[in-house]
C-alpha cells in the first residue's frame, strides 16, 4: 500500500499540470483573439478615416475646378457666372459628414473642414486664378474707397497696376465662411485701369453667397 501512494500523488500532479497547461493555452487563445480583434478594429477605423479624407479632398478639388473653369473661360470683356452647390454632388450626399462640412474661401484657396467619429478632417486646394471672396458691389466699394474710382469700365482706375493687385490681394486674405447647402456664386469680373494711351482690364473670379 505504501508503494502505491507516491504514484497516486504523481498522477494528481500530472492532472493539475495538464489542466494548468489547458488554462494557459485557453487564456493565450483568448488574448490572441482580443489582440487580433483590436488590430482589425483599428484597421477598420484607419480605413474609414482614410475614406473620409478622400471624400473631403474630392469635394475640395471639385470646387476648385469649378472656380478655375470660370477663370479659364476666355470671352474678353464679358463676365461669366455659375452657381455651385455642394449638396448636388453625389460624393457630398454619400459622405460620412452629412451636411456638416464648413466651406471657407479666401483669395488664395478653398478650405473644407469636417468632423466624423470625433476626428477632425481638413482639405485645402489653392486656386489657379486671382480670386476674391466677396461680390461685385463689395469689390467696387473697396476700390472706390481706396482709389476714388470703382474700376468699372465707366470709371477706370488711374493708379499703378501693382498697387491695385497688392491692395486686392490683402483685401482677399481673410477667409469667408460659405454654406454648403446653399448656392455659391462664382463670377468673373473685370477691373479696368487707364494707361497712358488706352484703357485695359484684368480679371478676378468672385466667390460669394
How should each PLM-predicted stretch be described?
Residues 38-209:
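Long, compositionally biased, intrinsically disordered regions
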Residues 2, 10-48:
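N-terminal single-pass transmembrane signal-anchor helix
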Amino acid at each position: 500500500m505504501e508503494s502505491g501512494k507516491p504514484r497516486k500523488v504523481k498522477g494528481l500532479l500530472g492532472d493539475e499540470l495538464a489542466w494548468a497547461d489547458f488554462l494557459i493555452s485557453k487564456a493565450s487563445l483568448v488574448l490572441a483573439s482580443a489582440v487580433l480583434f483590436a488590430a482589425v478594429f483599428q484597421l477598420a477605423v484607419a480605413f474609414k478615416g482614410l475614406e473620409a479624407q478622400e471624400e473631403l479632398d474630392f469635394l475640395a478639388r471639385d470646387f476648385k475646378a469649378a472656380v478655375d473653369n470660370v477663370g479659364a473661360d476666355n470671352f474678353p470683356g464679358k463676365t461669366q457666372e455659375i452657381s455651385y452647390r455642394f449638396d448636388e454632388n453625389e460624393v457630398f450626399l454619400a459622405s460620412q459628414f452629412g451636411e456638416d462640412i464648413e466651406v471657407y474661401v479666401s483669395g488664395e484657396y478653398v478650405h473644407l473642414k469636417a468632423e466624423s467619429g470625433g476626428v477632425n478632417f481638413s482639405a485645402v486646394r489653392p486656386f489657379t486664378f486671382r480670386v476674391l471672396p466677396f461680390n461685385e458691389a463689395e469689390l467696387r466699394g473697396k476700390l472706390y474707397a481706396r482709389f476714388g474710382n470703382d474700376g468699372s469700365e465707366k470709371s477706370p482706375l488711374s493708379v499703378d497696376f501693382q498697387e491695385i493687385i497688392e491692395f486686392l490681394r490683402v483685401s482677399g486674405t481673410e477667409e469667408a465662411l460659405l454654406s454648403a447647402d446653399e448656392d455659391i456664386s462664382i463670377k468673373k469680373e473685370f477691373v479696368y485701369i487707364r494707361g497712358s494711351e488706352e484703357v485695359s482690364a484684368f480679371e478676378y473670379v468672385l466667390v460669394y453667397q
